[in-house]
């Protein structure tokens, strides 16, 4: 019997690219190289994203020769569902295993306006935010575009059972999306494409901790995707304590990049502000935050801290959260308090984490 480690080693040695990593034009180019007509790309995308088949044999309007070429060139089974947990509020957390034995978490959230999915872009994270579980083990590797796409496909398959659909997505799972920029953009274009899952750009949100060069690059992209910044502090000193990335990308420089983005795109930006008891949740912090954001086309999303066993932060009292919100509103800041979802299954903001690959036990 093969052990887990031997299976993982075999997977690494024989791994093929994921078919979900290909954009439509890339599929057309590949078909041309194979001597196949490019219109087949649309048929293949239809099987992948509309019918959501799990193997090439089900692609019945393709020749056996083409199905064999696809099978020999691309993996179609990208993720394996290990665990599926359902919260008391209907939130579902999926634990997916990757080809190399690592596992990632993806979350489906229920809203009155539809179903939203929170996707992961990396195995672990290098950013080191002091309140987040995702960074505890450091960064293991980037996900391929197809591994990000496959998260949405797998969740949509689960929703197919009740004839529901993923209507929006947020790139706020494990990892720093802008550290995996090219795969992130490939994923977004595939998901947005009319031949793909066709989720509208304005129904997608990307969040970053503040990789400044990529903010400027993102401002030049042709997708009208919503953009969020994990801010969490109104000044550089406090932000450096909470988020070490601020030592590399200073808050004043970050604000300049944000203003450029807003001016270049005309789009409103969202600032995510986690509230940590006794750290960044006082009235003076709210006043300082309002001053920092003055004149910026933005929205502030207040996030009560979620429990992480390895972290020491405590939740801000409810009355203090409301006072913080009121202080911002009184100063003209557009602000809301995020609705908590999935807290009881560790699926809320800051609680997702990558799992190590299993060690050989026999």
Swiss-Prot record:
Xref: Pfam families: Radical_SAM, RlmN_N
Positions of disulphide bridges: 118-349
Active-site residues, record numbering mapped to chain: 105, 349
GO cellular component: cytoplasm
EC number from the UniProt entry: 2.1.1.192
GO molecular function: 4 iron, 4 sulfur cluster binding; metal ion binding; rRNA (adenine(2503)-C2-)-methyltransferase activity; rRNA binding; tRNA (adenine(37)-C2)-methyltransferase activity; tRNA binding
Subcellular location: Cytoplasm
CDD domains membership: Radical_SAM
Free-text cofactor note: Binds 1 [4Fe-4S] cluster. The cluster is coordinated with 3 cysteines and an exchangeable S-adenosyl-L-methionine.
Record's keyword annotation contains Methyltransferase: yes
Residues reported to bind S-adenosyl-L-methionine: 175-176, 207, 230-232, 306
Required cofactor(s): [4Fe-4S] cluster
InterPro entries: Aldolase_TIM, Methyltransferase_A, RlmN_N, RNA_MTrfase_RlmN, rRNA_lsu_MTrfase_RlmN/Cfr, rSAM
Record carries keyword Magnesium: no
Any one Gene Ontology BP term: tRNA methylation
Keyword entries, A-Z: 4Fe-4S, Cytoplasm, Disulfide bond, Iron, Iron-sulfur, Metal-binding, Methyltransferase, rRNA processing, S-adenosyl-L-methionine, Transferase, tRNA processing
Main location group: cytoplasm
Catalytically driven reaction(s): adenosine(2503) in 23S rRNA + 2 reduced [2Fe-2S]-[ferredoxin] + 2 S-adenosyl-L-methionine = 2-methyladenosine(2503) in 23S rRNA + 5'-deoxyadenosine + L-methionine + 2 oxidized [2Fe-2S]-[ferredoxin] + S-adenosyl-L-homocysteine; adenosine(37) in tRNA + 2 reduced [2Fe-2S]-[ferredoxin] + 2 S-adenosyl-L-methionine = 2-methyladenosine(37) in tRNA + 5'-deoxyadenosine + L-methionine + 2 oxidized [2Fe-2S]-[ferredoxin] + S-adenosyl-L-homocysteine
Cited function: Specifically methylates position 2 of adenine 2503 in 23S rRNA and position 2 of adenine 37 in tRNAs.
Further remarks about this protein from its record: Reaction proceeds by a ping-pong mechanism involving intermediate methylation of a conserved cysteine residue.
NCBIfam families: rRNA_mod_RlmN
Protein's recorded name: Probable dual-specificity RNA methyltransferase RlmN
Organism: Bacillus cereus (strain ATCC 14579 / DSM 31 / CCUG 7414 / JCM 2152 / NBRC 15305 / NCIMB 9373 / NCTC 2599 / NRRL B-3711)
């Amino acid at each position: 019997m093969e052990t887990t480690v031997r299976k993982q080693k075999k997977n690494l040695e024989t791994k093929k690219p994921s078919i979900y990593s290909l954009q439509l034009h890339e599929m057309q180019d590949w078909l041309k190289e194979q001597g196949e007509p490019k219109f087949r790309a649309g048929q293949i995308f239809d099987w992948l994203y509309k019918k959501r088949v799990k193997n090439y044999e089900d692609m019945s309007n393709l020749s056996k020769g083409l199905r064999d070429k696809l099978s020999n060139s691309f993996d179609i089974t990208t993720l394996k569902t290990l665990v599926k947990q359902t919260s008391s509020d209907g939130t579902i957390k999926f634990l997916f295993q990757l080809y190399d034995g690592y596992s990632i978490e993806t979350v489906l959230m229920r809203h009155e306006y539809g179903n939203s999915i929170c996707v992961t872009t990396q195995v672990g994270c290098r950013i080191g935010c002091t309140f987040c579980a995702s960074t505890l083990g450091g960064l293991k590797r980037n996900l391929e575009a197809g591994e990000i796409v496959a998260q949405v496909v797998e969740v949509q398959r689960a929703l197919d059972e009740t004839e529901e659909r993923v209507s929006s997505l947020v790139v706020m799972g494990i990892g720093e999306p802008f550290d995996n920029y090219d795969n992130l953009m490939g994923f977004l274009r595939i998901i947005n494409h009319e031949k793909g899952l066709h989720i509208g750009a304005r129904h997608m949100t990307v969040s970053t901790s503040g990789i400044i060069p990529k903010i400027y690059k993102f401002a030049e992209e042709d997708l009208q995707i919503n953009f969020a910044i994990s801010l969490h502090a109104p000044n550089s000193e406090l932000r450096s304590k909470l988020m070490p990335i601020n030592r590399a990308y200073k808050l004043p420089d970050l604000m300049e990049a944000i203003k450029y983005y807003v001016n270049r795109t005309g789009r409103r930006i969202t600032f995510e502000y986690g509230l940590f008891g006794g750290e960044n949740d006082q009235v003076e912090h709210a006043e300082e935050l309002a001053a920092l954001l003055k004149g910026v086309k933005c929205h502030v999303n207040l996030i009560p801290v979620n429990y992480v066993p390895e972290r020491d932060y405590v939740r801000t009292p409810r009355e203090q959260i409301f006072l913080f919100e009121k202080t911002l509103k009184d100063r003209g800041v557009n602000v809301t308090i995020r609705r908590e979802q999935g807290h009881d299954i560790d699926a809320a903001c800051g609680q997702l984490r990558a799992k190590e690959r299993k060690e050989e036990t026999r």
